[in-house]
C-alpha cells in the first residue's frame, strides 16, 4: 500500500476490526510502535500477521536480512516476509542462504523472494531453503519476477515429484 502512514494504519485497523479478514500484511518499516500496536490489535481479533519488508533497490547483506527477519518475529509476526531486488546472481544466493539460516532459527514461518528475472529461481525453489510460500500472477504480475500461476503450478509439481 503506498498511502501516507496514518491512512495506511487506519485501513489495516479497519480490516482487522471488520471480522472479515484472517490475515493482514504489515510493512516492517512502518515503525516499531505502529507495528507492535497493530500486531496486538490483530491478535486480539484472532487475525494473523505477516510482517513484510520490501527492498526494491537492492539485496542487503545476509546478516541484515537475518536481522530484519528476527526483528519481525520479535515484533510478534506470525509469518516473516522479505522481498529483495537482486543486482546479480550472487544476491540471489545471499537471499537463499539467509532463508535457509532463518528457517533454522526462527520459530515462525517465513516467506522470502528475490525479485525480477534474476530472482525467479528463489520463487521456484524457495521452499527447498525454508520459504513457506511463493506468489504467482493471475493476469498480470503485481511484483517484478512473478510468473503466471499456471506455469508456476506446473514447475512446482515437477519439483515436488522429484524431491
Regions found by a protein language model. Give the residues of each.
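Catalytic alpha/beta core domains of metabolic enzymes, predominantly
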Residues: 13, 28-163
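Glycine/small-residue-rich loop that forms an oxyanion/phosphate-binding "nest" at active or ligand-binding sites
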Residues: 1-33
Amino acid at each position: 500500500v503506498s498511502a501516507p502512514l496514518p491512512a495506511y494504519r487506519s485501513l489495516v485497523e479497519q480490516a482487522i476490526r471488520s471480522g472479515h479478514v484472517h490475515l493482514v500484511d504489515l510493512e516492517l518499516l512502518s515503525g516499531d510502535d505502529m507495528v507492535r500496536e497493530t500486531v496486538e490489535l490483530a491478535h486480539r481479533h484472532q487475525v494473523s500477521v505477516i510482517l513484510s519488508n520490501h527492498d526494491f533497490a537492492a539485496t542487503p547483506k545476509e546478516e541484515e536480512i537475518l536481522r530484519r527477519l528476527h526483528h519481525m518475529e520479535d515484533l510478534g509476526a506470525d509469518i516473516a516476509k522479505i522481498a529483495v531486488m537482486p543486482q546479480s546472481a550472487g544476491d540471489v544466493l545471499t537471499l537463499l542462504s539467509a532463508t535457509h539460516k532463518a528457517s533454522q532459527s526462527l520459530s515462525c514461518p517465513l516467506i522470502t523472494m528475490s525479485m525480477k528475472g534474476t530472482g525467479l529461481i528463489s520463487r521456484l525453489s524457495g521452499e527447498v531453503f525454508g520459504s513457506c510460500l511463493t506468489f504467482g500472477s493471475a493476469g498480470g504480475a503485481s511484483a517484478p519476477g512473478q510468473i503466471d500461476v499456471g506455469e508456476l503450478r506446473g514447475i512446482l509439481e515437477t519439483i515436488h515429484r522429484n524431491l
